[in-house]
Amino acid sequence: LHTKGSVPLDTITFYKVIPKHKFVLVKFDTQY
């Protein structure tokens, strides 16, 4: 899981892959 290097890319991918799990994105943002 490379979230420290692919934060913006992961965000877009997450939005397209898991648009219903917006809370997951928030959690990733908090960790970042």
From Swiss-Prot:
<dbReference type="GO" id="GO:0009306">
    <property type="term" value="P:protein secretion"/>
</dbReference>
<comment type="subunit">
    <text>Homodimer. Part of a large chaperone multiprotein complex comprising CABP1, DNAJB11, HSP90B1, HSPA5, HYOU, PDIA2, PDIA4, PPIB, SDF2L1, UGGT1 and very small amounts of ERP29, but not, or at very low levels, CALR nor CANX.</text>
</comment>
<comment type="function">
    <text>Does not seem to be a disulfide isomerase. Plays an important role in the processing of secretory proteins within the ER.</text>
</comment>
<feature type="modified residue" description="Phosphotyrosine; by PKDCC">
    <location>
        <position position="32"/>
    </location>
</feature>
<keyword id="KW-0597">Phosphoprotein</keyword>
<keyword id="KW-0256">Endoplasmic reticulum</keyword>
<dbReference type="InterPro" id="IPR012883">
    <property type="entry name" value="ERp29_N"/>
</dbReference>
<dbReference type="GO" id="GO:0042470">
    <property type="term" value="C:melanosome"/>
</dbReference>
<protein>
    <recommendedName>
        <fullName>Endoplasmic reticulum resident protein 29</fullName>
    </recommendedName>
</protein>
<dbReference type="Pfam" id="PF07912">
    <property type="entry name" value="ERp29_N"/>
</dbReference>
<dbReference type="GO" id="GO:0005788">
    <property type="term" value="C:endoplasmic reticulum lumen"/>
</dbReference>
